[in-house]
A protein has these predicted regions:
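N-terminal accessory targeting/assembly segments
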Residues: 1-97
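Short, flexible, glycine/charge-rich loop motifs used to bind or transfer phosphoryl groups or to couple energy/partner
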Residues: 33, 74-76, 105, 131-132, ...
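Residue-level signal for inorganic ion chemistry
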Residues: 40, 107, 119
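Short loop/turn elements that form and flank the Walker-type P-loop nucleotide-binding site
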Residues: 79-82, 109-112, 137-138
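Structural beta-sheet core signal
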Residues: 87, 116-118
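Amphipathic alpha-helical interface surfaces
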Residues: 96-99, 130
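Histidine-anchored nucleotide/phosphate-binding helix
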Residues: 98-108
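Canonical P-loop GTPase G-domain recognition
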Residues: 113, 120-156
Length: 156
């Protein structure tokens, strides 16, 4: 049987959620122990007979990957085929702007767009100097609050 093209949209250890080419979403698992798919991977999968799950049989080449070293010093892939990276911060607890900087730097290294999303503005963010700095150097800065529904249209 030939497989179907799909994209990994969520991972839960060795279980995944795939979006098939026709838009349907299915649960899947990976064939073998060495294959490691991550969110964003384009894969080939096929339905498993007498089950609702699908089986990922291969992972296509990645355009890029967001990586980090793991505790053993090996490179761990966090996401693949990234076309935009959005760093999310909130006013409380105080944002760790160094982490935001690291994500912006990763986006630059991968040559993909970067943006900063400041969430929970209903907590009273006020004027934020760091956000102004990102905006001043050309990164899109979006502010929103899911609680009071502000800024959500711009986010879409």
């Amino acid at each position: 049987m030939t497989g179907s093209q799909a994209q990994v949209i969520a991972t839960f250890s060795r279980r995944m959620r795939l979006r098939l080419a026709n838009g349907d979403e299915v649960d899947a698992r990976v064939k073998g122990k060495r294959m490691r798919a991550v969110c964003g991977d384009r894969v080939v999968a096929e339905p498993i007979a007498n089950e609702t799950d699908w089986l990922i049989t291969s992972i296509e080449d990645r355009d890029n990957a967001l990586t980090r070293p793991n505790l053993r010093g090996d490179i761990e892939v966090l996401a693949a085929n990234v076309d935009q990276l959005v760093a999310v911060a909130a006013p409380s607890p105080d944002p760790d702007w160094f982490v935001v900087d690291r994500y912006v730097a990763a986006a630059e290294q991968m040559r993909v767009g970067a943006a900063i999303l400041f969430n929970k503005t209903d907590l009273g963010s006020g004027e934020n100097e760091a956000l102004a700095d990102y905006d001043r150097i050309g990164y899109p800065v979006l502010e929103c609050s899911a609680r009071d529904r502000t800024g959500l249209d711009e986010l879409r």
